[in-house]
Protein backbone atom coordinates (compact mmCIF):
# COMPACT_ATOMS: atom_id res chain seq x y z
CA UNK A 1 0.00 0.00 0.00
CA UNK A 2 1.38 3.39 -1.04
CA UNK A 3 1.04 6.17 1.53
CA UNK A 4 1.32 9.90 0.85
CA UNK A 5 2.27 11.66 4.08
CA UNK A 6 1.13 15.29 4.25
CA UNK A 7 2.78 17.28 7.05
CA UNK A 8 4.44 20.52 8.05
CA UNK A 9 7.74 18.79 8.91
CA UNK A 10 9.96 16.42 6.96
CA UNK A 11 11.06 12.98 8.13
CA UNK A 12 13.97 13.71 10.46
CA UNK A 13 16.15 12.18 13.18
CA UNK A 14 16.43 15.47 15.09
CA UNK A 15 13.13 17.41 15.21
CA UNK A 16 10.40 16.05 17.51
CA UNK A 17 7.73 15.81 14.81
CA UNK A 18 10.18 14.37 12.29
CA UNK A 19 11.30 11.71 14.77
CA UNK A 20 7.72 10.77 15.56
CA UNK A 21 6.98 10.34 11.87
CA UNK A 22 10.04 8.13 11.55
CA UNK A 23 8.79 5.93 14.39
CA UNK A 24 5.46 5.55 12.57
CA UNK A 25 6.89 4.53 9.21
CA UNK A 26 10.34 3.03 9.85
CA UNK A 27 9.15 -0.50 9.00
CA UNK A 28 7.42 0.47 5.75
CA UNK A 29 9.09 0.00 2.37
CA UNK A 30 10.71 3.20 1.08
CA UNK A 31 8.99 2.71 -2.27
CA UNK A 32 5.60 2.83 -0.54
CA UNK A 33 6.17 6.27 1.03
CA UNK A 34 6.11 9.81 -0.32
CA UNK A 35 5.87 13.07 1.59
CA UNK A 36 4.49 16.52 0.88
CA UNK A 37 5.79 19.05 3.42
CA UNK A 38 6.09 22.83 3.79
CA UNK A 39 8.89 23.77 6.18
CA UNK A 40 12.33 24.87 4.97
CA UNK A 41 13.89 21.53 5.78
CA UNK A 42 15.72 18.63 4.19
CA UNK A 43 15.30 14.98 5.20
CA UNK A 44 17.99 13.62 7.52
CA UNK A 45 16.92 9.96 7.37
CA UNK A 46 16.47 7.56 4.47
CA UNK A 47 13.08 6.15 5.51
CA UNK A 48 11.53 7.86 2.49
CA UNK A 49 13.19 8.94 -0.77
CA UNK A 50 10.34 10.75 -2.52
CA UNK A 51 9.45 14.29 -1.43
CA UNK A 52 7.62 17.38 -2.63
CA UNK A 53 8.32 20.58 -0.70
CA UNK A 54 6.55 23.94 -0.96
CA UNK A 55 7.63 26.67 1.48
CA UNK A 56 5.80 29.78 2.67
CA UNK A 57 8.25 32.01 0.84
CA UNK A 58 7.54 30.16 -2.41
CA UNK A 59 3.80 30.47 -1.88
CA UNK A 60 3.99 34.22 -1.34
CA UNK A 61 6.12 34.62 -4.46
CA UNK A 62 3.77 32.35 -6.44
CA UNK A 63 1.01 34.94 -6.03
CA UNK A 64 3.20 37.19 -8.18
CA UNK A 65 3.68 34.50 -10.80
CA UNK A 66 6.83 32.74 -9.57
CA UNK A 67 6.93 28.94 -9.54
CA UNK A 68 6.53 27.05 -6.26
CA UNK A 69 7.49 23.52 -5.35
CA UNK A 70 10.58 21.31 -5.38
CA UNK A 71 10.87 17.57 -5.86
CA UNK A 72 13.49 15.99 -3.59
CA UNK A 73 14.91 12.49 -3.72
CA UNK A 74 17.56 10.27 -2.19
CA UNK A 75 20.36 12.64 -3.25
CA UNK A 76 18.83 15.39 -1.07
CA UNK A 77 18.93 13.35 2.14
CA UNK A 78 21.65 14.63 4.48
CA UNK A 79 22.15 12.22 7.36
CA UNK A 80 25.06 14.24 8.77
CA UNK A 81 23.07 17.40 9.55
CA UNK A 82 22.48 18.40 13.20
CA UNK A 83 19.13 19.89 12.22
CA UNK A 84 16.79 19.41 9.28
CA UNK A 85 16.06 23.16 9.05
CA UNK A 86 17.77 25.02 6.21
CA UNK A 87 16.36 28.54 6.55
CA UNK A 88 18.36 31.54 7.75
CA UNK A 89 18.15 35.32 7.68
CA UNK A 90 14.86 36.63 6.31
CA UNK A 91 13.43 33.16 5.76
CA UNK A 92 14.02 32.23 9.38
CA UNK A 93 12.45 35.50 10.54
CA UNK A 94 9.36 34.78 8.44
CA UNK A 95 9.06 31.37 10.08
CA UNK A 96 9.46 32.85 13.57
CA UNK A 97 6.72 35.40 12.88
CA UNK A 98 4.39 32.59 11.81
CA UNK A 99 5.16 30.77 15.09
CA UNK A 100 3.62 33.65 17.06
CA UNK A 101 0.21 32.36 15.97
CA UNK A 102 -1.92 35.46 16.45
CA UNK A 103 -5.32 35.52 14.69
CA UNK A 104 -3.89 37.84 12.04
CA UNK A 105 -0.92 35.52 11.43
CA UNK A 106 -3.28 32.56 11.04
CA UNK A 107 -5.54 34.46 8.66
CA UNK A 108 -2.65 35.86 6.63
CA UNK A 109 -0.86 32.53 6.27
CA UNK A 110 -4.05 30.71 5.32
CA UNK A 111 -4.78 33.46 2.80
CA UNK A 112 -1.46 33.30 0.98
CA UNK A 113 -1.69 29.53 0.79
CA UNK A 114 -5.14 29.86 -0.78
CA UNK A 115 -4.09 32.61 -3.17
CA UNK A 116 -0.76 30.99 -4.03
CA UNK A 117 -0.17 28.16 -6.46
CA UNK A 118 1.12 24.91 -4.98
CA UNK A 119 -1.41 22.88 -7.00
CA UNK A 120 0.54 23.04 -10.25
CA UNK A 121 0.95 20.59 -13.13
CA UNK A 122 4.31 19.67 -11.61
CA UNK A 123 2.74 18.85 -8.25
CA UNK A 124 -0.14 16.88 -9.74
CA UNK A 125 2.27 14.95 -11.96
CA UNK A 126 4.31 14.07 -8.87
CA UNK A 127 1.19 12.83 -7.04
CA UNK A 128 -0.03 10.89 -10.08
CA UNK A 129 3.36 9.27 -10.62
CA UNK A 130 3.47 8.07 -7.02
CA UNK A 131 -0.23 7.09 -7.21
CA UNK A 132 -0.98 6.81 -3.47
CA UNK A 133 -3.52 4.40 -2.00
CA UNK A 134 -4.21 6.71 0.94
CA UNK A 135 -3.26 10.05 2.48
CA UNK A 136 -1.81 10.16 5.99
CA UNK A 137 -2.20 13.74 7.23
CA UNK A 138 -0.26 14.96 10.25
CA UNK A 139 -2.62 17.58 11.63
CA UNK A 140 -1.70 21.05 12.82
CA UNK A 141 -3.33 24.38 13.57
CA UNK A 142 -3.47 25.88 10.06
CA UNK A 143 -6.64 25.35 8.00
CA UNK A 144 -4.87 25.30 4.63
CA UNK A 145 -3.10 22.01 5.41
CA UNK A 146 -6.43 20.27 6.07
CA UNK A 147 -7.70 21.66 2.77
CA UNK A 148 -4.63 20.33 0.91
CA UNK A 149 -4.84 16.85 2.45
CA UNK A 150 -8.58 16.63 1.78
CA UNK A 151 -8.20 17.89 -1.79
CA UNK A 152 -5.58 15.25 -2.62
CA UNK A 153 -7.64 12.44 -1.06
CA UNK A 154 -10.84 13.48 -2.82
CA UNK A 155 -9.17 13.99 -6.18
CA UNK A 156 -7.55 10.54 -6.03
CA UNK A 157 -10.67 9.03 -4.43
CA UNK A 158 -8.61 7.43 -1.66
CA UNK A 159 -8.96 7.20 2.15
CA UNK A 160 -7.68 9.98 4.40
CA UNK A 161 -6.21 9.22 7.82
CA UNK A 162 -5.52 12.03 10.26
CA UNK A 163 -2.82 11.86 12.93
CA UNK A 164 -3.43 14.10 15.95
CA UNK A 165 -0.34 14.74 18.05
CA UNK A 166 -1.60 17.89 19.76
CA UNK A 167 -5.02 19.39 20.46
CA UNK A 168 -5.92 22.28 18.18
CA UNK A 169 -9.69 21.82 18.31
CA UNK A 170 -10.98 22.25 21.87
CA UNK A 171 -8.48 24.93 22.82
CA UNK A 172 -8.87 28.30 21.11
CA UNK A 173 -5.83 30.02 22.60
CA UNK A 174 -6.76 33.29 20.85
CA UNK A 175 -10.35 33.40 22.13
CA UNK A 176 -9.81 36.71 23.91
CA UNK A 177 -7.98 38.41 21.03
CA UNK A 178 -9.32 40.44 18.12
CA UNK A 179 -10.59 38.06 15.40
CA UNK A 180 -9.73 35.07 17.60
CA UNK A 181 -13.19 33.48 17.52
CA UNK A 182 -13.63 34.24 13.82
CA UNK A 183 -10.30 32.63 12.97
CA UNK A 184 -10.99 29.52 15.07
CA UNK A 185 -14.44 29.01 13.54
CA UNK A 186 -12.94 29.23 10.06
CA UNK A 187 -10.25 26.75 11.10
CA UNK A 188 -12.76 24.29 12.56
CA UNK A 189 -14.79 24.45 9.34
CA UNK A 190 -11.78 23.03 7.45
CA UNK A 191 -11.07 20.56 10.27
CA UNK A 192 -14.59 19.14 10.28
CA UNK A 193 -14.66 18.75 6.49
CA UNK A 194 -11.42 16.77 6.60
CA UNK A 195 -12.44 14.65 9.59
CA UNK A 196 -15.90 13.95 8.15
CA UNK A 197 -14.21 12.53 5.03
CA UNK A 198 -11.50 10.67 6.97
CA UNK A 199 -11.56 6.94 7.70
CA UNK A 200 -10.00 7.18 11.17
CA UNK A 201 -8.05 9.39 13.55
CA UNK A 202 -4.77 8.33 15.14
CA UNK A 203 -4.39 9.96 18.58
CA UNK A 204 -1.34 10.44 20.76
CA UNK A 205 -2.89 9.28 24.06
CA UNK A 206 -5.95 7.49 25.40
CA UNK A 207 -7.58 10.63 26.79
CA UNK A 208 -7.42 12.30 23.37
CA UNK A 209 -8.86 9.20 21.67
CA UNK A 210 -11.76 9.14 24.12
CA UNK A 211 -12.54 12.85 23.80
CA UNK A 212 -12.18 13.02 20.01
CA UNK A 213 -14.31 9.91 19.46
CA UNK A 214 -17.09 11.53 21.46
CA UNK A 215 -16.79 14.95 19.77
CA UNK A 216 -16.25 13.95 16.13
CA UNK A 217 -18.06 10.58 16.20
CA UNK A 218 -15.11 9.09 14.35
CA UNK A 219 -13.05 5.96 14.98
CA UNK A 220 -9.98 6.90 17.08
CA UNK A 221 -6.91 4.73 17.63
CA UNK A 222 -4.23 5.49 20.23
CA UNK A 223 -0.63 5.31 19.05
CA UNK A 224 1.85 5.71 21.87
CA UNK A 225 4.94 7.51 20.62
CA UNK A 226 7.77 5.04 20.04
CA UNK A 227 11.23 5.41 21.52
CA UNK A 228 13.99 5.91 18.95
CA UNK A 229 15.91 2.96 20.43
CA UNK A 230 14.74 -0.42 21.69
CA UNK A 231 16.66 -1.06 24.90
CA UNK A 232 18.07 0.66 27.97
CA UNK A 233 21.16 2.80 27.32
CA UNK A 234 24.36 1.80 29.11
CA UNK A 235 26.67 4.50 30.47
CA UNK A 236 28.40 5.75 33.58
CA UNK A 237 26.29 8.44 35.23
CA UNK A 238 27.62 11.96 35.76
CA UNK A 239 26.39 14.68 38.09
CA UNK A 240 24.35 16.27 35.34
CA UNK A 241 20.66 17.10 35.06
CA UNK A 242 19.72 17.62 31.42
CA UNK A 243 16.86 19.10 29.44
CA UNK A 244 16.74 18.12 25.77
CA UNK A 245 14.17 19.56 23.38
CA UNK A 246 11.68 22.31 22.64
CA UNK A 247 11.63 25.42 24.84
CA UNK A 248 8.25 26.67 23.62
CA UNK A 249 5.01 26.89 25.63
CA UNK A 250 6.89 28.60 28.50
CA UNK A 251 8.97 25.52 29.22
CA UNK A 252 11.97 27.84 29.50
CA UNK A 253 10.38 29.49 32.53
CA UNK A 254 9.85 26.10 34.16
CA UNK A 255 13.55 25.37 33.67
CA UNK A 256 14.39 28.68 35.33
CA UNK A 257 12.39 27.56 38.39
CA UNK A 258 14.38 24.33 38.58
CA UNK A 259 17.73 25.95 37.82
CA UNK A 260 17.35 28.63 40.49
CA UNK A 261 16.36 26.03 43.08
CA UNK A 262 19.37 23.86 42.19
CA UNK A 263 21.71 26.82 42.68
CA UNK A 264 20.54 27.07 46.28
CA UNK A 265 21.83 23.56 47.03
CA UNK A 266 25.46 23.20 48.06
CA UNK A 267 25.91 20.15 45.83
CA UNK A 268 27.88 19.08 42.76
CA UNK A 269 24.71 19.45 40.68
CA UNK A 270 24.04 23.19 40.67
CA UNK A 271 22.62 23.84 37.20
CA UNK A 272 20.65 22.35 34.29
CA UNK A 273 22.37 21.55 30.99
CA UNK A 274 19.94 22.55 28.23
CA UNK A 275 20.19 21.20 24.66
CA UNK A 276 17.84 22.82 22.16
CA UNK A 277 17.75 24.30 18.66
CA UNK A 278 15.90 27.33 20.07
CA UNK A 279 16.91 30.64 18.46
CA UNK A 280 14.29 33.08 19.78
CA UNK A 281 16.10 35.80 21.70
CA UNK A 282 13.15 36.36 24.03
CA UNK A 283 13.67 32.79 25.26
CA UNK A 284 17.46 32.53 25.04
CA UNK A 285 17.89 35.52 27.36
CA UNK A 286 16.72 33.26 30.20
CA UNK A 287 19.27 30.55 29.40
CA UNK A 288 22.00 31.97 31.65
CA UNK A 289 24.14 30.90 34.60
CA UNK A 290 22.31 33.34 36.88
CA UNK A 291 19.22 31.17 36.39
CA UNK A 292 21.11 27.93 36.97
CA UNK A 293 21.18 27.07 33.28
CA UNK A 294 23.99 26.23 30.84
CA UNK A 295 22.74 26.39 27.24
CA UNK A 296 24.46 24.15 24.68
CA UNK A 297 22.35 24.64 21.54
CA UNK A 298 21.36 21.73 19.31
CA UNK A 299 23.24 18.44 19.18
CA UNK A 300 23.04 15.47 16.75
CA UNK A 301 20.84 12.47 17.54
CA UNK A 302 23.72 10.20 18.59
CA UNK A 303 24.93 12.78 21.07
CA UNK A 304 21.40 13.18 22.42
CA UNK A 305 21.47 9.49 23.38
CA UNK A 306 24.91 9.93 24.98
CA UNK A 307 23.81 12.95 27.03
CA UNK A 308 20.62 11.18 28.07
CA UNK A 309 22.49 8.01 29.07
CA UNK A 310 25.16 9.81 31.10
CA UNK A 311 22.82 12.19 32.93
CA UNK A 312 21.75 11.63 36.49
CA UNK A 313 18.29 12.80 35.41
CA UNK A 314 16.46 14.18 32.38
CA UNK A 315 13.71 16.76 32.72
CA UNK A 316 10.21 16.76 31.29
CA UNK A 317 8.27 19.92 32.02
CA UNK A 318 5.07 21.76 31.13
CA UNK A 319 3.90 25.19 32.22
CA UNK A 320 1.41 25.95 34.99
CA UNK A 321 0.03 28.85 32.92
CA UNK A 322 -3.64 28.17 32.10
CA UNK A 323 -3.33 29.07 28.41
CA UNK A 324 -0.24 26.89 28.03
CA UNK A 325 -1.91 24.02 29.90
CA UNK A 326 -4.75 24.03 27.38
CA UNK A 327 -2.28 24.06 24.50
CA UNK A 328 -0.35 20.97 25.66
CA UNK A 329 -3.15 19.10 27.45
CA UNK A 330 -2.76 15.97 25.31
CA UNK A 331 0.89 16.31 24.26
CA UNK A 332 3.16 13.27 24.67
CA UNK A 333 6.43 13.76 22.79
CA UNK A 334 9.07 11.40 21.40
CA UNK A 335 11.36 12.72 24.12
CA UNK A 336 9.19 11.10 26.80
CA UNK A 337 9.36 7.70 25.09
CA UNK A 338 13.15 7.99 24.77
CA UNK A 339 13.48 9.12 28.37
CA UNK A 340 11.42 6.17 29.61
CA UNK A 341 13.56 3.70 27.66
CA UNK A 342 16.89 5.34 28.49
CA UNK A 343 17.46 3.99 31.99
CA UNK A 344 17.93 7.53 33.30
CA UNK A 345 15.64 8.92 35.98
CA UNK A 346 12.98 11.34 34.74
CA UNK A 347 12.20 14.51 36.66
CA UNK A 348 8.70 15.67 35.68
CA UNK A 349 7.75 19.22 36.68
CA UNK A 350 4.31 20.49 35.76
CA UNK A 351 0.54 20.30 36.34
CA UNK A 352 -0.80 16.81 37.02
CA UNK A 353 -3.79 17.22 34.67
CA UNK A 354 -1.52 17.37 31.58
CA UNK A 355 -1.63 13.98 29.80
CA UNK A 356 2.15 13.52 29.75
CA UNK A 357 2.64 14.36 33.44
CA UNK A 358 -0.36 12.22 34.43
CA UNK A 359 0.94 9.31 32.36
CA UNK A 360 4.31 9.42 34.14
CA UNK A 361 2.69 9.85 37.55
CA UNK A 362 0.08 7.09 37.11
CA UNK A 363 2.85 4.65 36.21
CA UNK A 364 5.31 5.94 38.85
CA UNK A 365 7.77 6.39 35.98
CA UNK A 366 9.18 9.75 37.10
CA UNK A 367 9.84 11.83 40.16
CA UNK A 368 6.88 14.16 39.71
CA UNK A 369 6.69 17.69 41.09
CA UNK A 370 3.29 19.31 40.58
CA UNK A 371 3.83 22.75 42.09
CA UNK A 372 6.61 25.28 42.53
CA UNK A 373 6.21 24.96 46.31
CA UNK A 374 7.23 21.30 46.10
CA UNK A 375 10.37 21.90 44.02
CA UNK A 376 12.82 21.82 46.92
CA UNK A 377 11.44 18.56 48.33
CA UNK A 378 11.25 16.92 44.91
CA UNK A 379 14.79 17.89 43.94
CA UNK A 380 16.13 16.66 47.28
CA UNK A 381 14.43 13.30 46.64
CA UNK A 382 15.96 13.15 43.16
CA UNK A 383 19.49 14.03 44.26
CA UNK A 384 19.70 12.20 47.59
CA UNK A 385 17.59 9.04 47.27
CA UNK A 386 19.34 6.57 44.94
CA UNK A 387 16.93 3.77 45.86
CA UNK A 388 13.98 5.90 44.77
CA UNK A 389 15.73 6.84 41.51
CA UNK A 390 16.33 3.18 40.70
CA UNK A 391 12.72 2.31 41.49
CA UNK A 392 11.50 5.02 39.12
CA UNK A 393 13.95 3.91 36.41
CA UNK A 394 12.74 0.30 36.65
CA UNK A 395 9.10 1.38 36.31
CA UNK A 396 9.97 3.65 33.37
CA UNK A 397 11.84 0.98 31.41
CA UNK A 398 9.02 -1.54 31.94
CA UNK A 399 6.49 1.03 30.72
CA UNK A 400 8.62 1.77 27.67
CA UNK A 401 8.82 -1.93 26.79
CA UNK A 402 5.05 -2.22 27.16
CA UNK A 403 3.96 0.82 25.11
CA UNK A 404 6.90 2.44 23.32
CA UNK A 405 8.99 -0.20 21.57
CA UNK A 406 10.10 0.84 18.06
CA UNK A 407 7.88 -0.66 15.39
CA UNK A 408 4.74 -0.88 17.52
CA UNK A 409 3.21 2.30 16.06
CA UNK A 410 3.88 1.14 12.51
CA UNK A 411 2.24 -2.22 13.19
CA UNK A 412 -0.90 -0.47 14.46
CA UNK A 413 -1.01 1.82 11.42
CA UNK A 414 -0.55 -1.10 9.01
CA UNK A 415 -3.39 -3.00 10.65
CA UNK A 416 -5.80 -0.06 10.42
CA UNK A 417 -4.91 0.67 6.80
CA UNK A 418 -5.47 -2.99 5.87
CA UNK A 419 -8.93 -2.90 7.46
CA UNK A 420 -9.96 -0.07 5.14
CA UNK A 421 -8.08 -1.15 2.01
What residue spans do the PLM features occupy?
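Conserved nucleotide-sugar donor-binding subdomain of glycosyltransferases
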Residues: 76-134
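Conserved catalytic-core segment of nucleotide-activated headgroup transferases in glycan assembly
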Residues: 228-230, 234-286, 295-302
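Active-site proximal beta-strand in glycosyltransferases
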Residues: 3, 134, 138, 150-171
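Donor nucleotide-sugar binding/catalytic pocket of nucleotide-sugar-dependent glycosyltransferases
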Residues: 161, 169, 184-232
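A charged, aromatic-enriched C-terminal amphipathic alpha-helix characteristic of glycosyltransferases
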Residues: 370-373, 386-417
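N-terminal subdomain of nucleotide-sugar transferases
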Residues: 1-80, 220, 224, 228, ...
Amino acid sequence: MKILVVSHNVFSKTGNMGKTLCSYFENFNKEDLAQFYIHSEVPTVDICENYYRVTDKEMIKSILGFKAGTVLGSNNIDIDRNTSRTDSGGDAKLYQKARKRTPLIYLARNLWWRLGHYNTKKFNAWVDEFNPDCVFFVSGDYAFMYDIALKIAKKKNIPLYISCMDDYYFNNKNANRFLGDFQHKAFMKSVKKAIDYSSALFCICDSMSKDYNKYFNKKCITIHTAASFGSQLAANKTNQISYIGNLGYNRHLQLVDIGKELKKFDLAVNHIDVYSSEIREEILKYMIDENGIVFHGSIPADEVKKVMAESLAVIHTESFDENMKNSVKYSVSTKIADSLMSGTCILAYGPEEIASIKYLSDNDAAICINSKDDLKTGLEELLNDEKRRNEVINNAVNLAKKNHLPGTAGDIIKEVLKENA
